[in-house]
């Protein structure tokens, strides 16, 4: 099975606090993987390293690859990082869309990487590109909002627009950081259904950080759980039982309660 993401010996320190400890991880083509863990466990930090938004410590042997290309090595971004980013769609808790633009215009932004520079300066997109953008919006159930300003949409609708933009980008990997954290249950379900649909039907590899364990168990076949910057569990969601849940979350809560009491 093709390895899409490879992480070796990744460490990260913030203000003398070790957020990640020599993390090693392989993610394969077509997987939908949930990153779980308590607040401060390092799951969002790990995801941001995969995207090249932040760099790790300058540790010997640390290395991140995405689609066979180096993202960063020993604390330095690869010179051709843009080539990795061109194949990666990003979805964040804070909706990273342009509020003053329409839904369709936001989705067309996904085509910028494959559009000649002079066209991007004037936002000149071809008829074929606009048709593909409408098809992407149809996939996520948002085509009827195509000419509406993004700022008028609900949180769940904005997340679906972000997914449509990743489809427009023809991303091979989607990295989603807490995409349902601020959504109501019905909107969260729709967003997760959409991610699973493109994973299963388009073969797009999806890595998603979640606080909601029930969504991880329902939608993701594999769980990678982090605890205090270490990989605590990496395996099937079916084997992530109550005992592992207790060790991952409740023991951390007891440590925090004891610290407050002291």
Curated annotation (Swiss-Prot):
Question: What is the reaction catalyzed?
Answer: phosphonate(out) + ATP + H2O = phosphonate(in) + ADP + phosphate + H(+)
Classify the source by domain of life: Bacteria
Q: Which residues form a coiled coil?
A: none
Q: How does it sit in the membrane?
A: Peripheral membrane protein
Per the UniProt entry, the Enzyme Commission number(s) are 7.3.2.2
Q: Which residues bind ATP?
A: 37-44
> Is the keyword Acyltransferase assigned to this protein?
no
Where the record annotates domain ABC transporter, the positions are 5-253
A GO molecular function term, named singly, is:
ATP binding
Localized where? Cell inner membrane
User: Any one cellular component term from GO for this entry?
Assistant: plasma membrane
Its top-level enzyme class, in one word, is translocase
Oligomeric state and interaction partners are given as: The complex is composed of two ATP-binding proteins (PhnC), two transmembrane proteins (PhnE) and a solute-binding protein (PhnD).
**NCBIfam families, alphabetically?**
ABC_phnC, PRK09984.1
Q: Which family does it belong to?
A: Belongs to the ABC transporter superfamily. Phosphonates importer (TC 3.A.1.9.1) family.
What is this protein's record name? Phosphonates import ATP-binding protein PhnC
Give the organism's phylogenetic lineage: Bacteria, Pseudomonadati, Pseudomonadota, Gammaproteobacteria, Enterobacterales
Q: Which gene encodes it?
A: phnC
